[in-house]
Each structure stands twice: as C-alpha cells, then as structure tokens.
UniProtKB/Swiss-Prot annotation:
Residues passing through the membrane, by range: 26-45, 193-215, 225-243, 250-272, 305-327, 369-391, 401-423, 436-456, 476-495, 515-534, 549-571
Presence of keyword Transmembrane: yes
Descriptive protein name: UPF0324 membrane protein DVU_2133
SS bonds (residue pairs): none
Domain of life (superkingdom): Bacteria
Main subcellular location: membrane
Amino acid sequence: MAENESNVVVDQGQTKLSDLWTKEDYWAIWLGFVILIAGMWLFLANPSPEFAQKVDKANGVMAAEAARAPFKTLAYYKAQDDKGKLQGMDTPSGKAIGAFLTTPGAWASDPLEAFVLSKEAADERNAAAKAKFESAKVKSDAALAAAQAAEAAAAGAAFADAALNTEAQAKIAEWRAEHAKMKAAEKKTKTKPFNIATSLPMLMVALGLFFAVGMKFMGHDVPKFLVGFIGVFFVAVLALMMGHQSTMKYWGIGAEAWAIIIGMLVANTVGTPSFIKPALQVEYYIKTGLVLLGAEVLFDKIIAIGIPGIFVAWVVTPIVLICTFIFGQKILKMPSKTLNIVISSDMSVCGTSAAIATAAACRAKKEELTLAIGLSLVFTAIMMIAMPAFIKAVGMPQVLGGAWMGGTIDATGAVAAAGAFLGEKALYVAATIKMIQNVLIGVVAFGVAVYWCARVECREGHSVGWIEIWHRFPKFVLGFLAASVLFSVISGSLGSDMSQIMVNQGVLKGLSSPLRNWFFCLAFTSIGLATNFRELAHYFKGGKPLILYVAGQSFNLVLTLAMAYVMFYIVFPEITAKI
C-alpha cells in the first residue's frame, strides 16, 4: 500500500494549518509569488518616464493616421513599430537578469558554441548572414517603394477611391511581410560573443538554494537534495543545448523532449545514480512553473480578441475532452481511467500543464503522467511544423489559421512559433487563444477532482462532501489563478500600451518566463531520470494510448477549425476585420 501511495502524483491527507509550510503545492505557490513580487519590484516600481512620452507620441501619430485614412498607413505602422520597441527589461538591471538566466545558445556543429562564442565566431556568423540580410533588404525596400506609391495614389484621391484604397492596403501588406523577413535576417547579423560557462554554475547554486528552502520545511534532506540537484541541472543543461541545435530546432525537437530522452537513456542504461534521486522532484518544479504561467494569462487580452476566441477555447475544449474520455472508456476500453483522463486533458487543453493538474486531481500514477507528456511532446513537434505548412499551402487566412493552431497545438511556445511562421496576425490570434485555453487548467482540475470523488472512487451509500473535493483538488492551481487575477488587475490599471512594456516585456519576459522555462526543463529532466521503460511497456499494450491521442486530436482538429470559421467569419466578421 505504501508503495502505491508513493507512486501517485499527489498523496492524500487531511487538511491542517501546517500544510501551508509542509506541503509541496503550497510551496509552489509561495516560491512562485516570491518571483512575481521580485519582478514587480524590479520592473514596475520605477518605470522610465520616457516610456509614457514615447507611447503618447506614437499613439498621437496612429490616431491622426486612423482619422486620415480608412486603412493602416505606412506612418501608422512606423509609429506602431516604434512603440513595439519599448521594453521594460531594456534597463541595466533587466539586462543583467537576462544574462544571468540565459540558456545555452544556438549552434550547428560545435556544441561548445552553445556555451562560449568568441568574437571571431560571432563575426563569422554575422558575415555568413549578411548576404541573406542584404537580399531581404532589397526586397523590403522595393516593397516599401511600391507601398509608398500606392498610398500616395490613394491619398491623391482623398482616400475616396475604393480600388486605390484596396491596392494600397495590398501593397502595404506585402511590404509588412517583406519587412518582417528583413528584420529576421537582420537579427542574425547582430550575433554578439558570449560566455555562460561562469553564469551557469552560479544559476545552478541559486536555483538549488531556492528550491531547498521548501525542501527543508517539507522534511527532506537538504544536503542530499542539493547534491542531487547538480546532476539534474547538468542533464537539463544538456537538454537545453540539444534543443538549440539548428537541425533539432528546425524539426521542433525542443529542450523538453531532449530532457525526457536523455533522462530516460540514463535511467534505462547505466541507471540513475542514487545521489541524484533526492532531487527528482517533478511536481515541485513544474507546479512552481505553473504558478508563474498564471501571470501570463491576462483577462484584458482575452477580452481583446472577443467572443470568437472564447468560443474556440472554452466551448470546443470541454467537448473534445469529454468525448475523448468517453471514447477511451466505451470504445477503446482503456484499462486505466486515470491514464485516459490525463491523455484526454493533455491533448485537449494545453499539453503538459493540463496533464500535471489533471494527474494531481485524479491521483494518476507517475508513469501515466510520463506517458501522456511523451505523447504530447511528439505530436507537438509534428503539428508545429505540419500545420503552418498546410495552412500556407491551402491559402487559409491568417486569423483562421492562427485560431486553428491556437486551439489544437498543445504547448504555448510551439503555438507561438507556428503562428510566427504564418505572420503577425496568426501569431497574435494563436497565442491569445492558447492563453484563453490555459485558463481552463484550473477548471479542468476542479472538474476532474469532483468527478473522481463523486463517480470514480465513490463508495456505496456515501455522499461526497466539499472537504473531500478540497483534499483532492491540487492546491497549486489556486496560485495559478491568483497570479492570473493579480496580473490582470495590474495590466488593466496600466493600460494596454504600458502593460505591454512593463508587464509583458518586463516582469514576464524579463524574469518569470525565463525562470518558468528553467523549472519546466528541470521537471522534464526529472521525469526522464525517474522513468523505467519496463514500467511503461504494459500501458502501450494494443497501442490504445496512441489510438486515443490520435483519435482525440483528429476530432479536436475538425471541431476547432469548424468553430473558428463559424465564429470568426460568419457570426463575428466585424471582430475579425479589426484584428
């Protein structure tokens, strides 16, 4: 019995006041909020007055251009781009933090370049990228000249000629596409030398001590944890290095997948060294990261995209989750209900984040969680490449394509990468819908906790009370929701422009997001190092988990595309026109 209890994602227990400082879920909340509060102090306490001045100037130009022309002019876009360059993390302290949290860099054939890049090597990269940049600049300049001529013609007719206006819009859109390619090429000519060989050991010590505080209060052996953390961190760094290799990056095989692959190879060949095992704290790392993820779910962004996005995320997702679970139970006859629900939520909601919350709510075995996450990572890598290529091949509109990808690709980072492949609109829509979908993490965790208490593990003649649901409910989700509410209030009070600068490009991208990425990588590394192939083998009997995922994702793809088309192009076309 003791062995079974230790093999589930969350152990049962009675609620006590001491849980606040002895339980993992609460420590995930406390540590997450320590980071968020530090971020608010660093980036929100003393904003530069230049930010407000530059924003006001850009908004003035944009308002004047919007009043002058019935479409977004070149001057409008220039002002918009100038505003977009403002970043709260672009300060001495912000740059120092960014350098300290840096992960291994990009490399092609020499892995050492992920850690140390000399000035000569940086200059060589810049020179190699210069020709492509110059070619892109020629095309961008030509597109700009054509756009200027078309806009001038439309202006000459006082913007009263619909044909000239349409032509100007088309030429400006072409310039924006070429300009984006040019900026991407230009970025590759600005590679700077770096050396993170010294900062990585310091970061390892800092993160180890950070998590050790909670380990001490939870009754674990801190010295053994810190020694083991060295091994976990080392494997995580290797995974990040492999995830940034150019070929791996192209095919979407990121650090998360490599963390599990390398960890599993170690665990199932030489075996995970015993000194590392005290630091294999999968849930501790990932729950802390999920609390930080909550700060990225902002209500004002949800409102900005309107009802269409909410329908795509909040109507389709529960339908897909429930139907997939029923399919697994009734048709496939899945032997494990917990594996069924974890895979169903992983596939339908938002990948690993939903999987860990659901696994905690239904007390799934750790091997089941590992299997669900593995399936998610494999299909995420496939979909983030295949979907943009298909959307482009069939000529699907960016808004529709972005909504489709945002509702179906599991990982938030993969959604952004796939959206960026299509263009600005697709990136915005895809990322926003995925963020709206992330809100369901807490809802799904609560729903699964209630269902498992009332229907799956109910005892005859025994009514389910709220206290039992509370015991089952993963408490770290409260931190996720609290972070979302807090930062939504802060974002709303600052206004959309200053929120983008100080919150998105300050607290979040300057501190919490980089740390969240580190925490997730540590968690995936721990999953790999703790996984035994033999323990996973029986779950694949008959290929049922794979069939469940493929069937559910196929249904998800069809229903999401249909809902996105209906909501964005039939019911609310006016919202689509404004995006």
